[in-house]
Amino acid sequence: MKDQCENDAISGISDELLLSLRKVLGSCSVSFLFGAGVNGKAFPYFAQFNETISAMNQRGLDGSNIETALAHCADEQIRQAVLDTFVDEYNGYRNYRLDNESLLNLRRMLTAFSSIVEKAENRHPETKRLNVFTLNYDRIVEEILEDSGLFCYILTQGKSKGHLPFDIVGYNTTTHAFIPTFCVYKLHGSVDANRNLSSGNIVFPGQDKLGSILSNFYETLFAMKGELLKRNTVLFVIGYSWSDDHVNGIINDAIASGLTVYWLQYRPEDTLPKPLAGHVITIPPVGGIPVDTTKTLAELVERVGRI
């Protein structure tokens, strides 16, 4: 039954795509870029943040897009009021469960990648490291990795100065082998260990966003670019709306230097920014039906492992 379900979910995927995935997973350094959609139904999208949207509308801001609205808001008092509302509302959603179906799909995907990287022969120790660049504030990825017993390293604001894991890869002293190591980079900040978000630990969208990144998170942003510019690197983009111009610019520059990018498309109508169109390999939803893209990628990687 499981094989039949997998066949139904990725039956429209071409053999050419499977072979290309087999090639990159066998030798390339793997990185991920996660946006809000990676959490599926486990955590609300911004469109469900009714209190924040109301606070924005009351202050004359367009509540349909917080990124755009605050990027064009020069009034610091308004920005801070919206930020405080957002933080309070965000913390009201912190009681998510790791056994949510969408998070089980994410767990399955991360485990599948760990397995295929572990089994791949002739890998340089550095390629045993899997980079996870996330724009999300939550600790869902970290909690899943830790709960699954997968070796990981988390880079948050407190570790962003002079303590980057460029050369850290796990090693099994019994088997004398390097093991898959996930390095999670929190590009826009993070909740604390208790899932609590505070305004001082996030880079909130706004006019000073680039400045905030440069002052608090610039090393993390530059680390992302450095990793993606390395030879034989592949990036899997999941749940990302392509709304961050700085991140898009990094990806575009890296593609020009040889980066291979796979984008898991959630809906057929979802599109790439013009500079990236034609340079990114799109994996569409089979049959045009939206489904957790983590599930799609997990099944693809598992199938590649059986080829």
Residue ranges, per PLM feature:
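Conserved catalytic-core helix/loop/strand module for nucleotide-ribose chemistry
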Residues: 1-229, 234, 240-243, 250-307
